[in-house]
């Protein structure tokens, strides 16, 4: 019996390896499929995140009205909220973005003046006299950069066009994908557990529920935390007299999605803009960010997300380093929820195995009694 099982699984593994080998030799056959999957990856990812945010609301409304009508009602409320925000905040954002771009030449001049002052300092002179610093290499790098600047700008414009195209595709496709996820997503666990033996299906549904609750708690909690951080920083920047407070608050809210690293990324523009105005404002910007992050880390995050993820900070930092090296910013954003899901899955599997072992021991102990 054991030999037959080993023989069976050996053949299965060899068959899979053979398929992978053949696929690498005829990769052009799979190219259209790969392009199709890569095109739909971001819309599916965003729709999946929104599904875990909105699905609890749909389930709540479903108690009073049909599920499809609940989804349409959420869509209408969401569109109305976006329209209200665009009408009330849109002009302010436009004015601040325009002002920021108009002031960029002045900021560049200030940076150049600061660099010139530093070049005459004793520290800079000492640095230039070190053996590991080569003025000729620095000049060559600057010359090469300036010579390639037109080509870099052209390639950047092409990249911007590609980004705009992808964003347009996401905006068009995500609402449709999300609608059908919200409409039929609750049926998926019941369909998936049908591949399991009947005695395991109840436990399988519990595992699906635990994974869903973990993701929902994380994404909903992150949404609330980002809104709090962005709003609090905006108010703090206003009190500190920082220019472009709204834009800088939005940047802080967006970058806060990345644990630990995000606040530093979001604070950098505020500190730079504040420093261009006065060093005191840069210091105030740092104080605002520190206070908001203390409130977030010690009060809000434990209340909103709680002990749900139960992950040590060192583990998260290591995850961010590894995920950032492989997947960049996207990898850092997805590292924690993916780890939480994998961890919850394996913990449930271990729990299931222990339950089965205990039930077998109890069954074997019955005849002895």
UniProtKB/Swiss-Prot annotation:
It holds the Pfam family AI-2E_transport. The chain crosses the membrane at residues 13-33, 34-54, 73-93, 159-179, 213-233, 234-254, 271-291, 316-336. Keywords: Cell membrane, Membrane, Transmembrane, Transmembrane helix, Transport. GO terms for cellular component: plasma membrane. It comes from the Bacteria. It is a multi-pass membrane protein. GO terms for biological process: transmembrane transport. It is found in: Cell membrane. Coiled coil: none annotated. Belongs to the autoinducer-2 exporter (AI-2E) (TC 2.A.86) family. This is Putative transport protein YueF. The gene is yueF.
């Amino acid at each position: 019996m054991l030999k037959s099982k080993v023989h069976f699984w050996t053949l299965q593994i060899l068959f899979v390896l053979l398929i992978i080998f053949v696929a690498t030799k005829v990769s052009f056959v799979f190219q259209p499929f790969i392009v199709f999957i890569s095109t739909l990856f971001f819309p599916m990812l965003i729709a999946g995140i929104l599904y875990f945010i909105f699905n609890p609301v749909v389930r709540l409304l479903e108690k009073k009205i049909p599920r499809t009508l609940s989804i349409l009602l959420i869509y209408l409320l969401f569109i109305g909220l976006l329209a209200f925000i665009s009408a009330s905040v849109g002009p302010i954002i436009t004015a601040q973005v325009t002002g920021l771009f108009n002031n960029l030449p002045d900021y560049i001049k200030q940076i150049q003046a600061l660099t010139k002052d530093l070049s005459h300092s004793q520290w800079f002179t000492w640095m230039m006299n070190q053996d590991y610093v080569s003025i000729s290499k620095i000049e060559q790098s600057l010359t090469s950069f300036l010579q390639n600047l037109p080509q870099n700008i052209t390639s950047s414009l092409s990249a911007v066009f590609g980004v705009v195209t992808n964003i347009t595709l996401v905006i068009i496709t995500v609402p449709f994908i999300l609608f059908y996820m919200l409409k039929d997503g609750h049926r998926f666990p019941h369909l998936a557990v049908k591949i399991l033996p009947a005695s395991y299906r109840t436990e399988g549904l519990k595992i699906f529920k635990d994974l869903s609750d973990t993701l929902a708690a994380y994404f909903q909690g992150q949404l609330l935390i980002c809104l709090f951080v962005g709003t609090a920083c905006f108010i703090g920047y206003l009190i500190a007299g920082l220019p472009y407070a709204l834009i800088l608050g939005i940047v802080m809210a967006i970058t806060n999605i990345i644990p630990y690293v995000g606040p530093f990324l979001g604070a950098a523009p505020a500190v730079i803009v504040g420093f261009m105005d006065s060093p005191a404002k840069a210091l105030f910007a740092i104080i605002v960010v520190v206070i908001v992050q203390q409130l977030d880390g010690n009060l809000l995050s434990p209340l909103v997300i709680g002990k749900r993820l139960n992950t040590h900070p060192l583990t998260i930092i290591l995850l961010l380093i590894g995920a950032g090296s492989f997947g960049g910013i996207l990898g850092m954003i997805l590292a924690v929820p993916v780890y939480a899901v994998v961890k919850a899955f394996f913990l449930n599997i271990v729990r299931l195995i222990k339950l089965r072992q205990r039930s077998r021991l109890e069954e074997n102990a019955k005849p002895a009694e």
